[in-house]
Amino acid sequence: TSRGLGDVYKRQDTDSENKDSSDSSTTSVLLDTSKELTGIHHAEIEVKDYGTIDVELDADTAPITVTNFVKLAQEGFYDGLTFHRIMDGFMIQGGDPNGDGTGGSEENIKGEFSNNGVDNDISHTRGTISMARASDPDSASSQFFIVQADSTFLDGDYAGFGHVTEGMDIVDKICEDAKPTDDNGTIPSDQQPVIEKITITD
């Protein structure tokens, strides 16, 4: 269905964790995405006029998904793209170069979720970041979503690959401001929040 989204894991406190808010400088790293990543990594999603959403990425649980996301971020793929689908009380979805839910990157990746034969215990609770996809379980490419409210009905069908550690207030504000034109959360192109940059910090 078009209600595509993802899977994140147990969120503890998403609004405060090892982040010095007085430090406005971002240090980026260049990870080797020629092979699957492992371990925990972090990204900063800068949203124009809103601020930065800090995300922890779990490459031990979803190595293909995290490696793909990091690769695209490091290539600048997401720079200037938008959140084109916003549903208050559900999620925000972005990362489509077409800005309407029909686009993606050049390649699709395997869906890392249980109903596709992959163990993934990241539940779609508030703050989870997950991959959007079409009906094909292996159709995810660049579009991702961040869960605003617990949506565990997505568990097993979408590849959660991390969680927000700081910035859920920004997600809430984006949802609050959104004026979708239909029940599917479609946002007019001139009103879509802009992803200025996604920086991989470690």
Residue locations for each model-derived region?
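N-terminal, intrinsically disordered, polar/charged segments of Gram-positive cell-envelope systems
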Residues: 10-42
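Glycine-centered tight beta-turn/hairpin loop motif at sheet-sheet or coil-to-beta transitions
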Residues: 48-50
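Acidic glycine-/aspartate-rich tracts in secreted/extracellular proteins
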Residues: 88, 96-99, 136, 151, ...
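Internal glycine-rich, Lys/Arg-flanked active-site/core loops of soluble domains
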Residues: 53-135
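Active-site scaffold segments
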Residues: 91, 128-132, 141-174
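Short, hydrophobic/aromatic-rich segments at coil-to-beta transitions
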Residues: 37-44, 125-129
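Short proline/glycine-enriched turn/loop segments at secondary-structure junctions
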Residues: 181-190
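Single conserved hydrophobic/aromatic residue that forms the stacking wall/gate
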Residues: 1-9
